């Protein structure tokens, strides 16, 4: 440091002013710090070369001509300069901001801070609100959010052509918005509190991420986004799977760095803590939306008195006998039962609170499921105080004739169409195995035809979506090119006037013609680019319209596909319960029966190695370890392991030489791969069934049975590997 009056540094990262005394930085800014200032900070000779070790440094920004403080972690040392600057003003200690992780960000790709984008009573940034409103007006689909690739940085956030965006662009824009924020929504300090709450508290973690732990604007934005993700998960066929996928996609975006560790017990957050935290938060919102419906307004004073006979309990039908009472079923099954049903369709189930006497009425209204809690106290039931009905049956019977609008103006319907638990068995109308099998063949063929049509539409939709994105990128490139050419034209026009006047005085007609010709060429080129951009914009609008039509056709096919699959599954369950052989079922489904393996030749089924759990259950291993165990094994070799989803298991099986993984759900009715097949009392029962039953009924790509336990003696690698 001796001999130098000052030192020069160059900004590597952009920095926004946090305090009045701070300097704004842009990459490339040159900053000068005096030797006296560094000495006042206690920096030894040579320490100036390591600004990241100095901390906050007082200096002079040569671009803005301003003095102030800047973080040493955001700059690099250039060398000494022969400049003398005034010494530093006294200041207290201050923590450094976190250094950006991924290098310099491009100017224009960063949005303003959340505090600058909106103010209460607004609930979220207007850009985010518009994007999510557009998504929810279309159709919620967690698969679009779950794509692993990150969107390209966006420079235009005006959303002027939002109505032309396809679903992929909309979903990517939400991710892009979070990436473009200058700071993560969840601060490291708030994440640290959430980590502590997840380890020590059994209640909701979301309560921790409220002001003052999380700044107000971040807390409002987080709450708004979680409510949206909760709705996305609830609409998914498997909400639990959707919650995990959404958490994997959004966790790293909302919490860009893990919280500081160093708890008293020495524990530190796992690398996947952002995913675990968001999974917990989204699940809390899903549970809140489902299991805690708001109480209805107070009941009007004019209430019909309960009939005397019912009040005495003499003629009240049993709740268990009511066709609309489904007992303890999951919300996923309720959503499935009420899917695509008319307004007024309803059923009653046990409340998720598991408190005896409490139930939940699910009513279809406006194309959505409305949840109404049935309260119980002192032998009386109702939707709100006063509780005047002597049984749930009486309550439901009353509102099959009276509108619920007296409680809530939006519920202007009666309980019109009960979803009957008895009708579920009447879907199969044939009375013989052969007749049911023949009808199964018809339904399966219809399902395959619809599936092929949907797959073709999906491929077309994906292709056109990619083309639309390419055209949008091309239009942005045209805009940049036009801007460059117009600036060049303005510069040329300004210079041309001077040269034309000069050559006119000199009488140089040739040079004057050359300048005028160049000017005309430039104008012509700009006109051509404008014309090309206009044509591309017209093509974009037409293709966007076609893309929306494809999307509509796909959405119109979904109910048919789900209904056909539901009917086909019910026929399969009926045949399985009646003891139909899997070989015969495969013939009806058009599945080729493979050559008998060594286990199918066993006359005594009790001799199967599948009866020994140790031959196929491997406990807690991950996907990679499972794939290593099944490497070079023949088709049908399998194992069962613990799943990364809490309370579930996973089956890993070799299909066409590749290892596939599928979740085994554990529900109140038993184990299974999907509803309504969750029927097996144990994993062993499930394995024994699928030893001869193909998994293709659950996934068209799984044309295999659980033939060979991975640890069973017997068949080795496939013939090609020997």
From Swiss-Prot:
Keywords associated with the record: GTPase activation, Phosphoprotein, Protein transport, Repeat, SH2 domain, SH3 domain, Stress response, Transport, Ubl conjugation
**Location of the region described as Disordered in the Swiss-Prot/TrEMBL record:** 83-109, 287-319
A GO CC annotation given for this chain: nucleus
PTM description: Phosphorylated in response to signaling from activated receptor-type protein kinases. Dephosphorylated by PTPRJ. Dephosphorylated at Tyr-649 by PTPN13. Phosphorylation of Tyr-649 impairs while its dephosphorylation promotes interaction with FBXL2 and SCF(FBXL2)-mediated polyubiquitination. Ubiquitinated. Polyubiquitination by the SCF(FBXL2) complex probably promotes proteasomal degradation of PIK3R2.
Q: What InterPro entries does the record point to?
A: PI3K_P85_iSH2, PI3K_p85beta_SH3, PI3kinase_P85_cSH2, PI3kinase_P85_nSH2, Rho_GTPase_activation_prot, RhoGAP_dom, SH2, SH2_dom_sf
Enumerate the residues marked as the site Arginine finger: 147
Q: Which residues does the UniProt record annotate as the domain Rho-GAP?
A: 112-289
Annotated Pfam families: PI3K_P85_iSH2 (PF16454), RhoGAP (PF00620), SH2 (PF00017)
GO molecular-function term, one example from the UniProt record: phosphatidylinositol 3-kinase regulatory subunit binding
**SMART domains per the UniProt record, alphabetical:** RhoGAP, SH2, SH3
Entry-annotated residues carrying Phosphotyrosine: 458, 599, 649
Q: GO biological process annotations for this chain's record?
A: cellular response to insulin stimulus; insulin receptor signaling pathway; intracellular glucose homeostasis; negative regulation of cell migration involved in sprouting angiogenesis; negative regulation of MAPK cascade; phosphatidylinositol 3-kinase/protein kinase B signal transduction; positive regulation of cell adhesion; positive regulation of protein import into nucleus
Taking every annotated instance into account, which residue ranges of this chain make up the domain SH2?
Answer: 324-419, 616-710
Which residues does the UniProt record annotate as the domain SH3? 4-80
Q: Where is the composition biased (Pro residues)?
A: 87-98
The family database entries (PANTHER family) matched by this protein are listed as:
PHOSPHATIDYLINOSITOL 3-KINASE REGULATORY SUBUNIT, PHOSPHATIDYLINOSITOL 3-KINASE REGULATORY SUBUNIT BETA
The similarity comment for this entry is: Belongs to the PI3K p85 subunit family.
Q: How does it assemble?
A: Heterodimer of a regulatory subunit PIK3R2 and a p110 catalytic subunit (PIK3CA, PIK3CB or PIK3CD). Interacts with AXL. Interacts with FLT1 (tyrosine-phosphorylated) and FLT4 (tyrosine-phosphorylated). Interacts with NYAP1, NYAP2 and MYO16. Interacts with FBXL2; PIK3R2 is a substrate of the SCF(FBXL2) complex. Interacts with PTPN13; dephosphorylates PIK3R2. Interacts with XBP1; the interaction is direct and induces translocation of XBP1 into the nucleus in a ER stress- and/or insulin-dependent but PI3K-independent manner.
Q: What does this protein do?
A: Regulatory subunit of phosphoinositide-3-kinase (PI3K), a kinase that phosphorylates PtdIns(4,5)P2 (Phosphatidylinositol 4,5-bisphosphate) to generate phosphatidylinositol 3,4,5-trisphosphate (PIP3). PIP3 plays a key role by recruiting PH domain-containing proteins to the membrane, including AKT1 and PDPK1, activating signaling cascades involved in cell growth, survival, proliferation, motility and morphology.
Swiss-Prot/TrEMBL domain comment: The SH2 2 domain is required for interaction with FBXL2 and PTPN13.
Record-given protein name? Phosphatidylinositol 3-kinase regulatory subunit beta
- Source organism per UniProt: Rattus norvegicus
């Amino acid at each position: 440091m001796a001999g130098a009056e000052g030192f020069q540094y160059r900004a590597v990262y952009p920095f926004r002013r946090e305090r009045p005394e701070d300097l704004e930085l842009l990459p490339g800014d040159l900053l000068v710090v005096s030797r006296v200032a560094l000495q006042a900070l206690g920096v030894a000779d040579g320490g100036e070369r390591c600004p990241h070790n100095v901390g906050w440094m007082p200096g002079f920004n040569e671009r803005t001509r301003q003095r102030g403080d800047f973080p040493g972690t955001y700059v690099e040392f250039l060398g000494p300069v022969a400049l003398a600057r005034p010494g530093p003003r006294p200041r207290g200690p201050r923590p450094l901001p976190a250094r950006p992780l991924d290098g310099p960000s491009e100017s224009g790709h960063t949005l303003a801070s959340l505090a600058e984008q909106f103010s209460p009573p607004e609930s979220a940034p207007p850009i985010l609100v518009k994007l999510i409103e557009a998504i929810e007006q279309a159709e919620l689909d967690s698969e679009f959010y779950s794509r692993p690739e990150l969107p390209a940085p966006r420079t235009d956030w005006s959303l002027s052509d939002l109505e032309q965006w396809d679903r992929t662009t909309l979903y990517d824009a939400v991710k892009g918005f979070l990436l473009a924020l200058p700071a993560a929504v969840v601060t490291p300090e708030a994440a640290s509190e959430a980590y502590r709450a997840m380890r020590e508290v059994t209640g909701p973690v979301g309560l921790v991420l409220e002001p003052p732990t999380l700044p107000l604007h971040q807390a409002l934005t987080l709450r708004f986004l979680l409510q949206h993700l909760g709705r996305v998960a609830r609409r998914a066929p498997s909400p639990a799977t959707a919650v995990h996928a959404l958490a994997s996609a959004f966790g790293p975006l909302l919490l860009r760095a893990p919280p500081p560790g160093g708890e008293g017990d020495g524990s530190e957050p796992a690398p996947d803590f952002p995913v675990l935290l968001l999974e917990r938060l989204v699940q809390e919102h899903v549970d809140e939306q489902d299991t805690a419906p708001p109480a209805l307004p107070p009941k009007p004073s004019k209430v019909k008195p309960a009939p005397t006979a019912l009040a005495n309990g003499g003629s009240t039908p049993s709740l268990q006998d009511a066709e609309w009472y489904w007992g303890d079923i999951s919300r996923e099954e309720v959503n499935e039962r009420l899917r695509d049903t008319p307004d007024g369709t309803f059923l009653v189930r046990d409340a998720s609170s598991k408190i005896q006497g409490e139930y939940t009425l699910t009513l279809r209204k406006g194309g959505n499921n409305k949840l109404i809690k049935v309260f119980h106290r002192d032998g009386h039931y109702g939707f709100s105080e006063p509780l005047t009905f002597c049984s749930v049956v009486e309550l439901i019977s009353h509102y099959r004739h009276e509108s619920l609008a007296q409680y809530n103006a939006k519920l202007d319907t009666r309980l019109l169409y009960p979803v009957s638990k008895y009708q579920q068995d009447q879907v199969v109308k044939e009375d013989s195995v052969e007749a049911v099998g023949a009808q199964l063949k018809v339904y399966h063929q219809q399902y395959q035809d619809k599936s092929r049509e949907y797959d073709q539409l999906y491929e077309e939709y994906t292709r056109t979506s990619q083309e639309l994105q390419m055209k949008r990128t091309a239009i942005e490139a045209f805009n940049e090119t036009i801007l460059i050419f117009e600036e060049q034209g303005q510069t040329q026009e300004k210079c041309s006037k001077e040269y034309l006047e000069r050559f006119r005085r000199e009488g140089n007609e040739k040079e004057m013609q050359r300048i005028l010709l160049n000017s005309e060429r430039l104008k012509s080129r700009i006109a051509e680019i404008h014309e090309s951009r206009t044509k591309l914009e017209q093509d974009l609008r037409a293709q966007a319209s076609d893309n929306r039509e494809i999307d509509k056709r796909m959405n119109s096919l979904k109910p048919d596909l789900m209904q056909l699959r539901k009917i086909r599954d019910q026929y399969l369950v009926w045949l399985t319960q009646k003891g139909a052989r899997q070989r015969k079922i495969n013939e009806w489904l058009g599945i080729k029966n493979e050559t008998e393996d060594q286990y199918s030749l066993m006359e005594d089924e009790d001799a199967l190695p599948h009866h020994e759990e140790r031959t196929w259950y491997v406990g807690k291993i991950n996907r990679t370890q499972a794939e290593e165990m099944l490497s070079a094994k023949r088709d049908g070799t399998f194992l069962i392991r613990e799943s990364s989803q809490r309370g579930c298991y996973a089956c890993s099986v070799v299909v066409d030489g590749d290892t596939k993984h599928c979740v085994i759900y554990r529900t109140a009715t038993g184990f299974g791969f999907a509803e309504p097949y969750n029927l097996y009392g144990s994993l062993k029962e499930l394995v024994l069934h699928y030893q001869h039953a193909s998994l293709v009924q659950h996934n068209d790509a799984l044309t295999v049975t659980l033939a060979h336990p991975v640890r069973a003696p017997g068949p080795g690698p496939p013939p090609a590997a020997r």
